[in-house]
């Protein structure tokens, strides 16, 4: 039988909110870019706590997908594709992979004509993932 684990709706709502914070980037490009570039360059406690939480959640999601390989919901594929992407992203940032650093600098270029497209996409993704989490929370309550 398919089961939604207690933490799964919160997983999606957390990632959704994390993406939705990018609305700040549409409101104030400079402070948003300065904040995140500062976090990425300083690699202070906030950086390591955030990266640790993101990595832990991705590993949990991928493990859950694998554990339920024969009886998965469609949305658990997000764990594989999204989790793999985030883990690669965290790894590339940690080892300061040049091509990835160049991509991040492009993404945080406040003068880029693509700024609203890039961050708008992440905001839409965040809204979708947050709504998915809310839907899963409702379905989980119906399962109990």
Name what the model sees in each region.
Residues 15-53:
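Hydrophobic transmembrane helix segments
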Residues 18-26, 85-99:
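C-terminal TM-helix exit segments that contain a strictly Trp-centered aromatic cap at the helix terminus
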Residues 2-18, 44-48, 79-90:
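Alpha-helical transmembrane segments of integral membrane proteins, especially early/N-terminal helices
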Residues 140-144:
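Short, highly charged, low-complexity non-transmembrane loops/tails of multi-pass membrane proteins
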